[in-house]
């Protein structure tokens, strides 16, 4: 039979369906864009388009149920006990899911079992441990655009961290998206911004982006009359975005959000600006293949707690400019390193677990029994951590951590008394609350588990009380509990005995006491479970009262974990403390690339870097594979490590104020956007030339290589000149255009360096050592030979190279200048030598470029 292709939810015609399907369709109509998991017995079922989509995404069977307008209804399902695995996959694919549970009893329901939506799971609002990556913040982002300005609001519902900011360019917006990497991104249906890259993008109606509504919602959430106390009133676009975000979270959670009790503005000037391209090139969180291995986070993350791991990534992603705060971090690392007690602190921290997310689940009332067990274990560790910090000479950073750790002795004792040692995963089936915690619960449990002993005791009690030796207490399924007396002694039955059944030889009775017991026993299990759930909710109420100090404790532990990890990494990897200066300088002695050094088997060759007010740019030459890119990246990584408060892989390092780090290293076609490799390269270069300042660190590798020799050389020359003379940024400029080394003779702030190599028996040996002055040879053929180019091709190339370097003019041939290897007298280069880059604007540089092209064509 043909499957139905159009869902009746789009037709609003439910009349041809069964009552159960009508119930489903009414619910589905409220959530047209979400997958509805509809509980039916032991399965969650999906219908129509939801079924088709789920079958494809989850690789489950697509079947059919009943008919709709003569067509079979598509259906797919998953077992209820395995639903979390399927939800995890869907969320990671960017899908959102509605969970519709049975809340009625099928045995007593007249018509369809009552059902209601109990959970809405979206990628950015999920809080279940099984659905989350413990190393990554799970952030919901909202962007509100007005003309060329953007308001941004972000919330990590698993921590309560609520942040806003405003941005004035698309480039900065894309940099923030790359930094935050939201799990879910909301934008207005009217948003005109360039296509965004995020895991899950949803468009919201324009009326959700209303400033007045946002103010009202935020004040209600924070229980304030205004937002003045948060210092955000100067950010109207961001406030509007925050209002949309709060509406969405309220819609998905169907519960209060007590752990979201504050909002904070992120100031862009507080942090180093790192654009999306630079973030990828430096491999901060993932490598160039998108994997975490061999990234900076991979190297540094030896944290003991998941929340410490996430905080470390936030530090890496957002280096600070405040040298005072950075010095405090560095001093804390020094203290932990000097005392060599980071191992003991680590051992205690690893017992704490993901306290940050546990506290959030408590606030959302979705905490499971094992969350409370882990919380109890964490609270039990705090006194030891307090003592370990007390034994240290505490600087401001460590003192704040100790103060915020807190001691929760009362909560610890409560959880110790209330929760069994190893509780089940869920409260649903009971067995979570410890014996002895609650007398009514103990009584209900005793009735359920010790009813046989009660009957024995009651029988003995009644025999003694009535003096009737044939008294028996029993039970059957029809009549329930009874007291049995032989017919011969029935006349001696006490007056409070109520006849329940007469048999041939015995009479059976019930007493008020036995009736009460019967009612209790028959309902004791369900009542015990209900009582457990009631007590569990009371525990959550008690914990929610301590929500803010528990959040502060979790934050303090995360900070301690990161600082402790940086101390361990410094010791293990031989990092040293950098020195911060208030004047322009980047001076690194024996610097090393932290990741390359860690993964290579041979000893790493350390190199110096020296940039200051009079030495702004290094033109770096040398062979391919000689280490130019590694050298540039290590300089940037050392700078970045210092600006997160870490020690650095160098013997010594002096660093002045840095506001931005830019890289232009490598490029590939952007086929999706229709951009060639050269266009990508020029776009990245333009972004640097427009945004770099004299406090920026700029890495540029092989600018101009994607076009013809003259175009590329001219562009590289003009860009290097502009960086050195107009922007005066700290720049490492790697090139194979040896003509660029002439800049050092005309511009005082430009110096030449090269990565050394030697040739032996037509083979190249890379020394990877930085030397002053330009390289004298490119070693291109030797590198090609190393790459496996056939020997015959290499020999042919050598012959051609000799011809080009030493041209022989035949008698019948007019002398011709080879286009690829012009002598220095070439008019194009002569014209370049006459230029004064100090007086060039970008427009003038472009005009000169066209003149040079014309000159070349005329020749």
From Swiss-Prot:
One cellular-component annotation, GO: cytosol
PROSITE patterns: DNA_MISMATCH_REPAIR_2
Disulfide bridges in this chain: none
Sorted UniProt keywords: ATP-binding, DNA damage, DNA repair, DNA-binding, Nucleotide-binding
Sequence positions that bind ATP: 622-629
Signal peptide region: none
An annotated Gene Ontology molecular function: mismatched DNA binding
Pfam families: MutS_I, MutS_II, MutS_III, MutS_IV, MutS_V
Keyword match Flavoprotein: no
Stored SUPFAM superfamilies: DNA repair protein MutS, domain I, DNA repair protein MutS, domain II, DNA repair protein MutS, domain III, P-loop containing nucleoside triphosphate hydrolases
GO biological process: mismatch repair
InterPro entries documented for this protein: DNA_mismatch_repair_MutS (IPR005748), DNA_mismatch_repair_MutS-lik_N (IPR007695), DNA_mismatch_repair_MutS/MSH (IPR017261), DNA_mismatch_repair_MutS_C (IPR000432), DNA_mismatch_repair_MutS_clamp (IPR007861), DNA_mismatch_repair_MutS_core (IPR007696), DNA_mismatch_repair_MutS_N (IPR016151), DNA_mismatch_repair_MutS_sf (IPR036187)
Family, similarity comment: Belongs to the DNA mismatch repair MutS family.
Function: This protein is involved in the repair of mismatches in DNA. It is possible that it carries out the mismatch recognition step. This protein has a weak ATPase activity.
Protein name listed in UniProt: DNA mismatch repair protein MutS
Organism lineage string: Bacteria, Pseudomonadati, Pseudomonadota, Gammaproteobacteria, Legionellales
Gene (name only): mutS
